[in-house]
Each structure stands twice: as structure tokens, then as C-alpha cells.
Amino acid sequence: MQDSSLNNYANHKNFILMLIILFLMEFARGMYILSYINFLPTVTSIAVAITSLAFSIHFIADASTNFVIGFLLKKFGTKIVLTTGFILAFTSLFLVIWFPASPFVIIFSAMMLGIAVSPIWVIMLSSVEEDKRGKQMGYVYFSWLLGLLVGMVFMNLLIKVHPTRFAFMMSLVVLIAWILYYFVDVKLTNYNTRPVKAQLRQIVDVTKRHLLLFPGILLQGAAIAALVPILPTYATKVINVSTIEYTVAIIIGGIGCAVSMLFLSKLIDNRSRNFMYGVILSGFILYMILIFTLSMIVNIHIVWIIALAIGLMYGILLPAWNTFMARFIKSDEQEETWGVFNSIQGFGSMIGPLFGGLITQFTNDLNNTFYFSALIFLVLAVFYGSYFIANREKAK
């Protein structure tokens, strides 16, 4: 009994420390990717094309690394992989201090940061306890969201004081996360040193076994990300509100998401499979309705209400979807499978803005992008609703 209590305490301590490390790394990512490089064209000689390229390369590096990181963790161990990641992130962001307007450094740092964050995410997802998955995944996604948003806002404020003087803060945050890592005992589901060919075969095998999940993983991210390029224009040109009022809508949605992740996500634990199915299906249908409704709304107060509803639903849909995916994963392939899933999700987030921007540009109508996003959620609702009904019938 005492050994069990000590083991539970150690697992809880490790989980909390990893949450803090994830928060700090996402904080650094928010500072650099969402704030610093976006402001560079306005305060230095860096061209917008360079910062746009850096932004894209960051997420390409992230998605590509996710695809193989689980296998690298199993082959080389967590200490080598994570330490390498921290070195890459710290060194690249440290270079920004000395070369704040170098195109090569800006792009290189974005790529290295994308690689460095990947193993932390995979370890977090694979270390979640099954009987507490909903609750703990709520904490994981909350740490991610809070880190990104607070990092972005914090860097925005520092840039207003001076555009480049506080660049050292980004590498400092990574250094703190790196130090905290040495107080964590990270364990994998198993270790193996299989040859590269065998690992490639396993990637193909993992992919084939989880094809059912890929539409949901890919299209959810694409549907949400498709709206990103048009939302500022929608706010200022269609609703005719200021940037501040638009920012308030984002904050309200973020607060709703945070509340849901912290308090509602635990509802997923110890509930029936049908309850989880209901949450996922309701989430897809509600998203379809709310996004379609946005195309007809010109009142900012109603937009705020919709933003709150979207945030609340997102905060419980993510843990529910994560729990659904977890049921398909073999216990000894957690790291590899979550890595592949994250890679597919990252690819969806990359193609979403591309489609959203192109639809608006070629049709010259913002509403068509809202229709596109809503249609994706309708397709997901029909596809997985059919699966849930069929699976429920089989279980009887």
C-alpha cells in the first residue's frame, strides 16, 4: 500500500512538472512564432515573405518530427531526445539575441523550435492515465493554450517597450524548462532498438490500423484553421468593429475553452462509451451550426456569445476525441502512435489556412470560407455518427 502511494505521488509529481515544461515551451513558441516574427517586418528590414516562410517551416518541422519522434524516443531514450530538443531550441533562440534581423536565423530558429516541442507533446499524451484521461487531457490542452496565448501577449507588450531588446526572454524561458526537466523521471511504454526498416514498416502498420481516425484528426484542424486568415477581415469589414473588440471575442473564446478544459473535461472519465460518442457528435453538429451562423451575424455581442459557446465546446470536445482515439492505441505503441496522430493533425492545421485564403480570394466572398468550414464538420458528424450508430448496434 505504501509503495503504491509513493508510486502515485511520483507519477503525479512527474505529470505536474511535465505540464509546467509544456507550458513554458509553448510560452516560448507563442512569444516567437505568434508575436516576435510577426512584428519583425514592422520594426526591422525583414520582409513579410521571410516571416511567412518561417511561420510555415515551423509547423512543417513540427508535423514532420511528430511522425517519427515516437520511434526516436524508443530507440535513443527520453534523455537524449529531450536534451537534444532543448539544446536546439535554446541555441536557436539565443542566436536571435545576436542576429535579430537575420533571415537565416529567423527561419532556422522557427524550424528548430518546431522540432524541439514535438517530443514533449508525445510524452505528455502517452503518459496520461487511462482512468483520468478526460481530466488530465483537459490540463494538457489548457497548459498548451495558456502557454501560447500568454506568451504571445507577453511578447507583444515587450515589443511595445522595445522591438528587439527583450529577445533574450525567449531563450531564458526555454532554459528554465530545460532545468526543470532534470527533476522529472520520464518513462516510456517500452524501449526497442529495431532497425530503421522495421521502424518504417511499423509506421505503415500504425497508419493502416488507424485510418478510421484520420478524417477526424486531419479535418478538424483544417476546418478551424481555414477561418484563421479571414477572421480579422470578417471582424473589421463585415461586423465593422475595432481590433480591440475582435480581440475581446478571441479572449472570450479562450476563457470559455479554459473553463471547459479545467472543469468540464473530467466529465469524460468514468462515463459510458455512448456518452463519449454523444459529446463528439454534439460537438461536430454544434460547430457546424455556430460557424454557419457566424456568416449571417453582424452584431458583435452575438459574436461574443458564439465565441464563448465555441470555446466551451472545444474544451470538452478535445478530451472526448482524445479518449476516443486512445481506445484504438496498443499499450506498447503509445509514443509512436501519438506521434503519427500529431503529425496528421499538424498537416491539417497547415492546409486549412491555405484553403481558407484561396476560397476567399477566388470567390471574393468571406462567407464561402465559413460554409466550407461548416461543411467539413457536417461531413465529420455524418461519418462518425454513422460509425457510432453501427458500433452501438454491434455492442448490443
From Swiss-Prot:
Key words of the record: Antiport, Cell membrane, Lipid transport, Membrane, Transmembrane, Transmembrane helix, Transport, Virulence
Topology of the protein relative to the lipid bilayer: Multi-pass membrane protein
Entries under SUPFAM superfamilies matching the protein: MFS general substrate transporter
UniProt superkingdom: Bacteria
Pathway membership: Cell wall biogenesis; lipoteichoic acid biosynthesis
GO-annotated biological processes: lipid transport; lipoteichoic acid biosynthetic process
Any one GO cellular component localisation term in the record: plasma membrane
Alphabetized Gene3D superfamilies for the sequence: MFS general substrate transporter like domains
Main subcellular localisation: membrane
One term of GO molecular function: antiporter activity
Compartment annotation: Cell membrane
Membrane-spanning residues: 15-34, 46-73, 80-99, 105-126, 138-159, 165-184, 211-231, 243-264, 276-298, 304-326, 338-358, 370-390
InterPro entries named in the record: ATG22/LtaA_families, MFS, MFS_dom, MFS_trans_sf
A Pfam cross-reference name: MFS_1
Protein family membership: Belongs to the major facilitator superfamily. LtaA family.
Function per UniProt: Proton-coupled antiporter flippase that catalyzes the translocation, from the inner to the outer leaflet of the cell membrane, of the lipid-linked disaccharide (anchor-LLD) that anchors lipoteichoic acids (LTA) to the cell membrane.
Protein name: Proton-coupled antiporter flippase LtaA
Gene: ltaA
